[in-house]
C-alpha cells in the first residue's frame, strides 16, 4: 500500500513537472525574442541599459530551457504515460539508460536537446566572452537568441513534446529497438554539440558583417576556439555514429554514404576548411571574407541537415518520422537564415577584405588550396545528396546516388588535401622557397617511396589502390614527425636544446601534430579495411566449418535467449585463431513492446582487424540450415581510433587556445571594432 501511494505521488509530481516544463518552454520563446531585440537595438544605439538586459535575458533563456528539458526527462524517468511523447517513445520495463536516452531518441525531444545546447553555447559566450567589446557581445547574443527563438517556435507549433493524452496509457510503445544501444545514447548529444556549435562562428560572422567599420584579424582569434570545439565534437559524434552502425546494423560496413550520414559530414568538411582559413585570417589578416562565408556555410549546412532529417524527404535508418508542416517550417527557417546571411555578406564583404599579401609559394597559398579542395569536396557530397531529391521534384522520377559516385568524386579531392596537410607546414608565411620546403620533406618522400615499393613487391603488383593509400598514410605520418622535428630544431642543435624547445612548445602545436597523426591512422584504417576486406555468405549446418583469413570457424547451432525486454535466437560460433580459441555469438532479437526484429553481430576485435559474424534466417524446409555472413575487416578499428586521436588533438589545442588567446584578454581587444567602442 505504501509503495502504491509513493508511486502515485511520483506520478503527480511528474504531471506538475510537465506543466512547469511546458510553461518554461512557452516563456522561453518570448525571452528569446527579447534577447534578439534588446541585443540588436542596444548594440546599434550603444545603449548600455539594453545591452545589460540582453545579457541577463540570455541567462534566463538558458535557465528556462534547462527547466523544460529536465521536466521532460523526469517524465521519462518516472514513466508518466499521460504525456504523448513518453507513450510513443518509452516503456516502463526499459532500463534507466534507455528511458533517459529516449528523451532525445525522437523528433520532439531531440529538438529540445538542440535548443538546450544552443542556449548553453550562448551562456558560455556570455561567461567566457566578458572581455569582448560589449557592443559585439550583445550583437552575438542577439543572433543566438534569434536562432533559439526560431527553433523554440518550431517545437511549440509543430513538435511539442509536452502534449498530454487522456486517459493516460497503461504503458508505452518503447523506444525504437535499433536505438536501444549505449552508443546511440551518447551519439546525438555529441553530434549536436558539433552541429549547434557552428552557430557561434555564424553569430560572430553576422555580428562582424553588421559592424559599422569592419574588423581586423582579431575576429579570427575570437572564433577559432569555438570552431575547434565544434569540430572536435562533430568528429566524435560522426565517428560514434559510424561505429554504432558497424556493430548494430549487421551489414559489416562502417560508412554507406547514407543521406543522413552526409548531412553531418558536410558541416564537418566545411568546419575543417573554416578551421584552416581562420589560421590565415588571424596570422596574415587575409581571407577574412572567405572565413566569414565559411562560417555562414558551415551553420547553413547544419540547418540543411536538420531539414533533410526532419522534413520527410529522405528515407534513412537515421531519419525521424515527420509531417509536411515540419518540413515547410524548417525549410522556411533555412531560407530566411541562409538567404538573409548571404545577402548581408554580398552587401558587406567587400569592406572587410584586404589586398592579397602573399606569394603563390607560401603557407597561405597552401592553406587556400586546402580550403578550395575541402569546399569542392563539400559541394560534391551536397550534390550527390540532393540530386535524387531534385530529380524527383522536377521529373517525378526516383533515382539513387550510391557509394560509387561519392568514392569517384571524393577521393580525387581528399587525396591532394591530405598531401598538402603534410607539405604546407614546411612553407614559410608570406613568401617561401619551394626547393627548401622540398628538401625538408625529402626523407618523408624517401620513406614513402620505400613503403610503396615494398608493398608493391610483396603484393606482386596487385591491390594498387590500397598500396597507394598506405603510401599516403605513410607520407602523412612522416610529415607529422618532420614538422615536429623542424619546430624543435632536431639535428641542428644539441639534443638537450631540442628537448628544451619541445618542452616550451605551445600545446596548440602538439595538438596539431596529434590531430594530423590521427588523420594518418584514419587513412590506414580506411585503406586497409576497404581494400583487403574478405566476406563469406553461405548456408551452414551445425558442426560445419568455415575457413576465413586464418580463422577456423565452426557453427555450433542456435539457442533461444531472452533479454529484459526482448526475445531472440543466438547463433553460436566456435573460433580458432592460431593458439587462441574463443566463442562468438550473433543474435536475432524481437522486442516485445514494438514487435520489431533486430540483428546483433558477433565481433572479435584485434589491433590488426575484426572478425565479424551475423546469423541470418533458417531454411524454410531444413530448419537447421542457417544463413550466415562472416567478414574479416583488417584494421577497421583504426578508423575510429584515428577519429578519436583527431578529436584529442583538437582538445589539446583547445586547452591552449582558451588560455593564451585574446578572447579572454581585454588587451587583444583594443583597436577592434573601433567605431563601436
Model-inferred region functions:
Residues 12-677:
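Solvent-exposed, non-transmembrane regions of integral membrane proteins
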Residues 2-15:
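Short, Lys/Arg-enriched N-terminal segments with co-localized hydrophobic residues
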Amino acid at each position: 500500500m505504501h509503495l502504491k501511494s509513493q508511486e502515485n505521488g511520483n506520478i503527480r509530481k511528474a504531471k506538475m513537472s510537465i506543466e512547469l516544463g511546458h510553461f518554461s518552454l512557452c516563456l522561453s520563446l518570448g525571452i528569446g525574442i527579447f534577447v534578439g531585440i534588446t541585443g540588436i537595438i542596444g548594440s546599434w544605439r550603444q545603449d548600455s541599459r539594453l545591452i545589460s538586459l540582453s545579457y541577463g535575458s540570455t541567462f534566463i533563456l538558458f535557465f528556462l530551457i534547462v527547466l523544460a528539458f529536465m521536466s521532460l526527462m523526469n517524465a521519462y524517468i518516472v514513466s508518466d504515460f499521460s504525456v504523448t511523447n513518453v507513450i510513443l517513445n518509452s516503456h516502463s520495463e526499459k532500463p534507466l539508460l534507455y528511458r533517459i536516452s529516449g528523451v532525445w531518441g525522437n523528433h520532439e525531444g531531440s529538438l529540445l536537446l538542440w535548443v538546450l545546447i544552443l542556449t548553453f553555447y550562448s551562456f558560455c559566450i556570455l561567461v567566457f566572452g566578458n572581455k569582448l567589446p560589449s557592443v559585439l557581445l550583445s550583437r552575438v547574443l542577439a543572433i543566438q537568441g534569434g536562432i533559439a527563438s526560431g527553433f523554440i517556435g518550431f517545437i511549440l507549433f509543430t513538435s511539442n513534446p509536452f502534449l498530454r493524452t487522456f486517459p493516460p496509457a497503461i504503458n508505452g510503445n518503447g523506444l525504437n529497438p535499433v536505438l536501444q544501444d549505449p552508443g546511440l545514447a551518447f551519439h546525438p548529444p555529441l553530434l549536436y554539440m558539433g552541429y549547434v556549435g557552428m552557430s557561434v562562428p555564424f553569430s560572430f560572422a553576422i555580428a562582424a558583417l553588421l559592424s559599422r567599420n569592419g574588423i581586423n584579424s582579431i575576429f579570427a582569434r575570437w572564433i577559432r576556439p569555438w570552431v575547434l570545439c565544434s569540430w572536435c565534437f562533430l568528429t566524435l559524434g560522426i565517428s560514434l555514429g559510424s561505429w554504432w552502425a558497424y556493430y548494430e546494423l549487421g551489414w559489416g560496413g562502417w560508412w554507406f554514404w547514407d543521406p543522413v550520414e552526409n548531412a553531418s559530414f558536410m558541416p564537418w568538411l566545411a568546419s575543417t576548411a573554416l578551421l584552416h582559413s581562420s589560421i590565415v585570417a588571424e596570422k596574415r589578416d587575409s581571407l577574412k571574407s572567405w572565413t566569414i562565408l565559411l562560417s555562414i556555410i558551415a551553420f547553413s549546412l547544419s540547418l540543411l541537415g536538420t531539414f533533410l532529417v526532419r522534413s520527410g524527404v529522405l528515407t534513412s535508418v537515421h531519419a525521424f518520422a515527420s509531417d509536411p508542416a515540419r518540413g515547410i517550417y524548417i525549410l522556411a527557417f533555412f531560407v530566411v537564415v541562409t538567404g538573409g546571411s548571404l545577402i548581408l555578406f554580398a552587401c558587406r564583404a567587400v569592406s572587410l577584405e584586404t589586398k592579397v599579401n602573399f606569394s603563390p609559394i607560401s603557407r597561405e597559398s597552401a592553406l587556400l588550396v586546402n580550403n578550395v579542395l575541402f569546399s569542392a569536396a563539400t559541394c560534391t557530397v551536397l550534390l550527390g545528396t540532393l540530386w535524387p531529391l531534385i530529380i524527383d521534384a522536377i521529373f517525378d522520377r526516383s533515382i539513387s546516388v550510391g557509394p560509387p559516385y561519392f568514392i569517384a568524386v571524393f577521393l580525387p579531392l581528399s587525396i591532394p588535401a591530405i598531401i598538402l596537410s603534410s607539405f604546407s607546414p614546411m612553407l614559410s608565411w608570406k613568401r617561401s622557397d619551394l626547393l627548401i620546403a622540398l628538401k625538408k620533406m625529402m626523407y618523408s618522400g624517401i620513406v614513402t617511396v620505400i613503403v610503396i615499393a615494398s608493398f608493391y613487391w610483396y603484393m606482386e603488383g596487385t591491390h594498387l589502390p590500397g598500396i597507394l593509400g598506405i603510401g599516403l598514410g605513410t607520407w602523412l605520418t612522416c610529415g607529422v614527425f618532420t614538422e615536429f622535428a623542424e619546430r624543435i630544431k632536431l639535428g641542428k642543435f644539441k639534443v638537450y636544446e631540442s628537448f628544451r624547445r619541445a618542452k616550451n612548445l605551445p600545446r596548440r602545436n602538439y595538438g596539431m601534430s596529434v590531430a594530423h597523426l590521427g588523420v594518418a591512422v584514419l587513412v590506414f584504417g580506411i585503406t586497409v579495411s576497404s581494400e583487403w576486406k574478405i566476406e563469406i555468405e553461405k548456408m551452414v549446418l551445425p558442426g560445419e566449418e568455415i575457413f576465413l583469413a586464418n580463422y577456423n570457424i565452426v557453427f555450433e547451432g542456435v539457442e533461444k535467449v531472452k533479454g529484459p525486454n526482448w526475445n531472440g535466437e543466438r547463433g553460436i560460433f566456435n573460433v580458432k585463431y592460431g593458439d587462441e580459441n574463443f566463442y562468438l555469438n550473433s543474435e536475432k532479437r524481437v522486442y516485445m513492446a514494438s514487435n520489431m526484429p533486430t540483428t546483433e553481430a558477433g565481433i572479435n576485435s584485434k589491433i590488426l582487424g575484426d572478425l565479424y559474424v551475423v546469423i541470418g534466417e533458417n531454411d524454410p524446409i531444413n530448419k537447421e540450415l542457417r544463413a550466415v555472413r562472416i567478414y574479416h575487416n583488417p584494421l577497421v578499428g583504426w578508423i575510429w581510433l584515428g577519429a578519436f586521436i583527431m578529436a584529442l588533438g583538437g582538445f589539446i589545442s583547445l586547452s591552449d587556445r582558451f588560455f593564451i588567446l585574446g578572447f579572454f584578454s581585454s588587451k587583444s581587444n583594443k583597436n577592434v571594432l573601433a567605431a563601436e567602442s
